[in-house]
Amino acid sequence: MYKDNGFTGFKSVESLLNDKSVLPEVPGVYIVIRDQKTAPVFLKIGTGGFYKREDPNVEISTLQANWVETSKIVYIGKATSLKKRIGQLLSFGDGKDVGHRGGRYLWQLADSRNLQIAWKATPNETPREVERQMIQEFKSAHGGMRPFANLQD
């Protein structure tokens, strides 16, 4: 489904932490996918970094309330450079003090290292507009809920 829409990559967080060279240095959007058949296990303390000394962790009840059972997409993001922004997301998830608090719920998933990231270049469109449209389409398909780790439209 996502491949038909121009997304490429589909690399695990674990593999991208080991080799970010596959990430393109172009503007675009990216999605984070949890392709597991089992229910998610939420961690009280995740692996996210404490950017500006702010605790990235939230209550498990908050994570449960935001979980979208009917979707494999758990986050939609935008980037002026996919390599840089996805790199920041990965570094934040690896506990670094990096400015990527968006998506922080991802790192309270017990299987966060198995999440997959796919990306799509948007050479003729503004990444923010594409992201906004994708989130709106997601909300329409999922009863008004955003992807699990998207905290704003």
Regions found by a protein language model. Name each.
Residues 139-153:
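Alpha-helical oligomerization segments
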Residues 87-115:
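Aromatic- and Lys/Arg-enriched surface recognition patch
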Residues 89-92, 137, 141:
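Mid-sequence acidic-hydrophobic segments that form the walls
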Residues 1-84, 117-135, 151-153:
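GIY-YIG nuclease catalytic motif and its immediate N-terminal context
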Residues 35, 39, 102-105, 143, ...:
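Positively charged, low-complexity intrinsically disordered regions
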Residues 64, 68, 87, 107-110, ...:
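Generic, ordered loop/turn and secondary-structure boundary motif
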